[in-house]
Amino acid sequence: MRSRARHAVLAVTGAVLAGAPLALTASPAHAASPTRSAGSPGTINVHRGGPARSLPFTARRDGEAVISFTASAPGVSWVRGGAESAVVSIAVDGRHVTDLVVPSSDPIPRSLGLGRVGKGRHKVTLRFAEGSAPAASRVTLRRPAVRMPEADALALRHAPVVVGRTGWPFGDPYQNATTDTPLVAWHETRPAATPGHKIIEYSVVWSNEDGGTDTPALMARWGRTTDIEWIYRVEVDASGRRVDGTAVYQAPMHLTLKFTGRYEGDHPLLQTCTQNNNMCDVSSPDPPLRFLLDAAGTRPDGRAREVVMDREPWTYRIAAQEMVREKKIENPSDPATREVGDQRTYLFVEFAKTTGAATGSGSVPGVALGVRLKSDPSRLYRSDHDEPTWSIDRDGAVATTVELPEGTRVSDIAGIEALRRPTGTGDNGAPATVTSINRGFFLDDSFLPQPSSVEWKGSVTLTQANPSAVLWRP
């Protein structure tokens, strides 16, 4: 969950970071490698068929290490079949710790865990890996920096290793290099029942899910086409040690099961084993891809999980490109249909709501958002496309999208409304109260979020008698 600004600071500061400076030099992994293959100062180039590159560093204490850089791969684009990504295998002192999937020729800020290292000298080795698309020939890593952040040490220590999906539906051990790739991870903490103990929960954003919620419902109910799941939760004591028997993970069918698998240090090994990115704690033999994402970031209180994507804007582009490549986008886009159109035609909105007590029997109410345009205020564009099950019945900060005619801008909007409706048969009469719009934006021509232009705070209660209310006007 690093912002672009923070990535820039990390890259510039290089070795003097987090109170644990590291000495860094880029060099060939083999003495015979040509010097120029290291690129310009502060740049490492990893070539298909070329030698591995190495990055020596010195750790001034024991602890968890993280590597950051901006990554690009000429000729690569997640939107094109045969050019989806380049893959770099990353090892520390000869031990494979993580892989990097590079889905773009444009530089993307990335941060990956390297696992626990001891005090002293170490070497990061980077190799161009199998699973790279045919169009990929080189990966460029600019301003690589290894750091050992003390403030985030506990979260990094217990972060899970996500082993890539290898089996059904594709039977391809490298499938996460072309579909449902892990993009970003973060953690959240809360007090445990035992004084001084904490519970740490880890979540991951994937580029999509090949199963589970269908794409139109994802946009309506979750405000995105990525998949976001919690994957691992554990209790730690006051010294940061794992409390035996407390580790659980999100298993197939969204079950919460005890983790009984293998650890690398304190890092549990979990494998993505379903089409909708649920986990198994037993891995397939010799899986080629593994992801130790930097999970040091967390989510602000009172914000939806999608704020993680907002802080990594490139994730919106990758999500949109996967939809285009997998032919999940209708053409031309039409807000009158339920099918997902060009994601640049959607208003991406986060709002907060609560549901009151039921007064009768029947289904719980959900809330959708509606948008009216200045050009025709009589027409209402709904986030749920008038599908009852696509309104949002969960409480707290939530995200949705509203599909609008191509070319619509925020300046064209006459108003945004909250719309209460039961999600099934009958209506239990519970009121729904909306208290904020936290952000609203369109994607630009490059599928990157524009600055938020829609915010509102207040309190509007929706009832059976008064099921709609205007939240925002320009």
Q: For the regions a protein language model found, what residue spans apply to each?
A:
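Glycan-recognition and processing domains
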Residues: 32-62, 75-82, 135-140, 304-340, ...
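Structural beta-strand segments of beta-rich domains
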Residues: 53-55, 61-67, 198, 343-347
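Beta-strand-rich ligand-recognition modules
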Residues: 41-43, 48-52, 70-146, 376-415, ...
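A domain-level signal for the mature, folded cores of soluble proteins
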Residues: 96, 111-116, 137-229, 241-342, ...
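Secretory targeting and sorting signals
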Residues: 1-33
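Short coil-to-beta strand junction motifs in C2/discoidin
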Residues: 78-88, 139-140, 223-229, 342, ...
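Extended, charged low-complexity segments
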Residues: 368, 374-474
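Residue-level detector of short, conserved catalytic/binding motifs and their immediate flanks
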Residues: 65, 88, 122, 198-200, ...
